Amino acid sequence: MQSTDYTDLDSQLEYWNTEGPQKAFAHPLNLRRMTHWLSLDSVIIDFGCGYGRSLGELAEAGYDNLIGLDFSPAMIEAARERFPEITFEQIESVKIPLPDESVDGALLFSVLTCVPTDDGQRAIVKELHRVLRRGGLLYISDLWLQSDERNLTRYARDEQKYGTYGVFDLPEGVTVRHHDPKWIETLTSDFEMVALDELEVVTMNGNPARAFQWFGLSLKREQ
């Protein structure tokens, strides 16, 4: 059962089951920053792990307490085949099956772009904040709003439909989102940002794009 804040538009499960395993995801993993905040025995989760590429890189670097979570059964099956030594779990809601403050680090790679709504994104980040220990690392890699004509046309075309500038439909039948820096700042208000890198990536459809990698430490509010 899905969270009331996380809709079918946010999960788009049929698309990821059929098209996801064939897509190439190219956001690089910054191991230098990871090892600065997370020792090799850290418990690390990858929310929206896809076919496990990022966790595979972490395992190769020596991390061994790794958990991948994804809604898509096809993606989880592909991840288990590629990396049998890593734990991968299919989830059916945003709720992460782990206790409060039980995780040292969390990856959110190319996930927000696949979750078009504010509420859907908030639900994910809130749940990651719950499971991260105080001072635990959240590492987001995603796409900024772009400035090229192709993307500007798509933003303008679908802004009224979705009510958010930067949300648009792709021809293959999936809805995605590019992000305003102010929204990312609002979304991550329960974290202390400790680094922000900007870079060029190639999207899952082979197009160049401006991306960001955001690193923040979990702040726990007093009860």
Model segments located where?
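Class I (Rossmann-like) S-adenosyl-L-methionine-dependent methyltransferase catalytic domain
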Residues: 1-42, 47-95, 139-223
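Short amphipathic alpha-helical segment that frequently serves as the phosphate-/nucleotide-binding helix
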Residues: 28-31, 121-125
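GHKL-family ATP-binding catalytic core of two-component histidine kinases
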Residues: 97-99
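A conserved beta-strand element that flanks and buttresses the S-adenosyl-L-methionine
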Residues: 107
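Short catalytic micro-motifs in class I SAM-dependent methyltransferases
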Residues: 110-114
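Conserved catalytic-core motifs of eukaryotic protein kinase domains, centered on the activation segment
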Residues: 117-119, 151
